[in-house]
């Protein structure tokens, strides 16, 4: 029994050290195959993530490092092995992929522990359209919207500090620090540009976001703790909370007196590096939360974050944009008639609801950049597609409209959708006319004036809408929960809106 206990202690002690795994030949193959079988990562075009990974070259590199007995020889050949600007690109790729595989498997093992199992406050959905019903249900009862963009350019030392909170191997963390500071291109968190995406950058981005959201959960737990203390109402709030602050030590040295409020709610939504928090609170406390996030980036992540980058809006007076939609609140008045014995009285009931619209002016500008129309919205021919066959031209326009219609199916103003349909329909006709060196009338005669509406998508969409709206006549919009990716035009629109908000500030 004593021998078994000693062996267990040795195994636990060995699990803390990750540095020797870099020199294990079989670990890379096993870990890489395990990750492929478990996650089934989709291919991303024009990215460094899907380049071929040669394990033969990896073994050669491991053998070379093992043979270097002298430290001076290692220092001489350091730039050849670790420098990304070196002619042989594969050395840096081997180090990057090896670190990513080790870190991924290490955190997968840690995720099964009880510490991470407690992190159940967040719901992660695959469909993007699940965000919009959540906004309609919960943001209606909020007063203010706080939105900002998560900075992606951070110092490598911050990433090392985040990883050191879970990694106990000092030599491995020193190796990470050495590689990150030597090659800053390896630790770029701009994973949304396809040219710079790597497996290591994806892992670092997720660990960075996890640290951010985990801290927010802990802060909101403290708020619920203060709400549960009933004796705080009769006592002085300022002195009582400052006493609790000295007992409960937090990572940020900020006064918690503005946290206490009876009716307080927070709703958090994030996509990529853009997040929105809906706050149900007074104007004073909402401004305090804006200041809190400013100090949060400054003291917790050591990032010089400008206060102007955090936008705070009142929902009742301003609209807010998210994922290509523009949301706002409108009041509807309902007249209720009540018959009494001698009189007939009318009662006006006002009800608030969130409406979602598509910004047609911004969409027309994006369609003009893609050469589907001009800046005024007049359709033009797509000259780059004139070399394709007629069926390929039909399929491309049909696919663009199909994705656009499904994504913006929950908007209130359907006229904007029909305007986009008009632009794509006439652009398709002009492209065919330019290809055959004829006029639009010839295209109408050959394919019919409603050729764009005769596709399989429109027939299927008409059948679904007729059956659905007959069963539910009061519903005027549909959210499709099988949409997994954001529309390309909506993504460009979101970036454009963020740029205009920065210029206005």
UniProtKB/Swiss-Prot annotation:
It is found in: Plastid, Chloroplast. The keyword RNA-binding applies. One of its GO terms (cellular component) is chloroplast. One of its GO terms (molecular function) is RNA binding. One of its GO terms (biological process) is tRNA processing. Belongs to the intron maturase 2 family. MatK subfamily. PANTHER family: MATURASE K. HAMAP family: MatK. Usually encoded in the trnK tRNA gene intron. Probably assists in splicing its own and other chloroplast group II introns. This is Maturase K. It comes from Physcomitrium patens. The gene is matK.
């Amino acid at each position: 029994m004593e021998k078994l206990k000693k062996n267990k202690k040795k195994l636990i002690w060995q699990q803390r050290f990750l540095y020797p795994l870099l020199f294990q030949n079989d670990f890379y193959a096993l870990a890489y195959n395990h990750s492929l079988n478990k996650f089934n990562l989709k291919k991303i075009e024009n990215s460094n993530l899907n380049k071929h990974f040669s394990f033969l070259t990896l073994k050669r590199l491991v053998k070379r490092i093992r043979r270097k007995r002298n430290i001076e020889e290692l220092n001489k050949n350091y730039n050849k092995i670790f420098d990304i600007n070196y002619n042989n690109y594969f050395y840096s790729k081997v180090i990057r992929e090896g670190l990513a595989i080790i870190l991924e498997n290490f955190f997968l093992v840690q995720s099964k522990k009880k510490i991470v199992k407690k992190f159940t406050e967040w719901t992660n959905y695959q469909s993007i359209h699940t965000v919009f019903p959540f906004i309609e249900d919960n943001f209606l009862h909020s007063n203010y919207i706080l939105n900002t963009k998560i900075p992606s350019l951070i110092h490598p030392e911050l990433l090392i500090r985040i990883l050191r909170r879970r990694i106990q191997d000092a030599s491995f963390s020193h190796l990470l620090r050495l590689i990150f500071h030597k090659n800053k291109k390896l630790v770029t968190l701009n994973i949304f540009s396809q040219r710079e995406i790597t497996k290591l950058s994806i892992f670092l981005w997720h660990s960075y976001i996890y640290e951010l959201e985990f801290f927010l959960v802990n802060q909101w737990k403290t708020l619920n703790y203060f709400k549960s203390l009933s004796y705080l109402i009769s006592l002085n709030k300022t002195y009582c909370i400052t006493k609790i602050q000295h007992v409960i030590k937090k990572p940020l040295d900020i006064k918690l007196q503005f946290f206490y409020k009876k009716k307080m709610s927070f709703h958090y939504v994030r996509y990529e590096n853009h997040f929105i928090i809906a706050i149900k609170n007074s104007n004073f406390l909402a401004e305090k939360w804006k200041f809190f996030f400013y100090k949060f980036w400054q003291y917790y992540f050591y990032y010089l974050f400008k206060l102007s980058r955090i936008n705070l809006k009142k929902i009742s007076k301003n609209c807010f944009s998210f994922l290509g939609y523009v949301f706002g609140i409108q009041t509807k008045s309902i007249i209720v008639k009540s018959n009494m014995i001698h009189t007939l009285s009318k009662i006006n009931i006002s009800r608030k609801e969130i409406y979602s619209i598509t910004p047609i002016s911004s969409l027309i500008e994006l369609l003009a950049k893609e050469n589907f129309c001009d800046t005024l919205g007049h359709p033009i021919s797509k000259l780059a597609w004139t070399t394709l066959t007629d069926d390929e031209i039909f399929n491309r326009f049909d696919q663009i409209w199909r994705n656009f219609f499904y994504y913006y199916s929950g908007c209130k103003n359907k006229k904007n959708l029909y305007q986009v349909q008009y632009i794509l329909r006439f652009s398709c006709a002009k492209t065919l006319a330019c290809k055959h060196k004829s006029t639009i009338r010839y295209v109408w005669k050959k394919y019919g004036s409603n050729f764009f509406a005769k596709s399989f998508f429109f027939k299927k969409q008409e059948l679904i809408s007729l059956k659905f709206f007959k069963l539910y006549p009061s519903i005027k919009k549909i959210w499709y929960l099988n949409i997994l990716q954001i529309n390309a035009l909506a993504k460009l629109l979101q970036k454009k809106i963020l740029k205009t908000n920065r210029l206005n500030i």
